[in-house]
Amino acid sequence: QIKNQNAEAKLTLAPVVNFRDFHSINKDHQFNVEQSHSGNKVRIVLDKNSETPIYMNCSDGRYFKHIDDTFRNMYYLREEERGFEAEENHYVPGVYSINLEPNEEKEITFVCSLEENIEEIDGIKVINKELLRMTGIIYDTGIIQNSKMNDKKLDMLKALILATDNFIVNRPSFGLHTVIAGYPWFLDWGRDSLISFEGLLLLTKRYEFAKEVLLTNIRDIKYG
């Protein structure tokens, strides 16, 4: 949501994209980009080795395609602190230009997805639905209602309950939920899943997910 002041203004949204393994960075990579757009819906194939198009859409403004536009030397402070290479180049496929009238207020959503029907996605509805789901996650546990903690500790507890949700994902190959060992880089490891099983799934009363996680691990047993 944006509210303009008393003069005409222009908001420019410039998405940056990349295609690489998460253990590496692109510094001197030449992207072989193919893109097409219809209105504000953009389809991008970022590299000849990529078989999956990326789709982008903005609820407002107008899209302007760029050619050979690179955002250079993005700096990663944490990578520097860890002793890794800390600068990377990204590709800028184009920009969304949004005009704002004096004192105008707008709700603008930008959606990037692998789903082709991206123009049908209402960003505001997605956000509101997720906020409602997150509230359900917190209160369905029953932990908050029975807590006698002060507000500061209660906020920390809510954040912790929400954090557990990041580790529970759907595994399409089995059609079951599983626990990943470290979001988003690691896959599901049986040992880590079972170590965290009680805290992630039982204390939070995710019993159906707990059942699916056990079934997933059973299927992964050697010769099982």
Name each model feature, range by range.
Residues 1-224:
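Acidic, mature catalytic/reactive cores of soluble proteins
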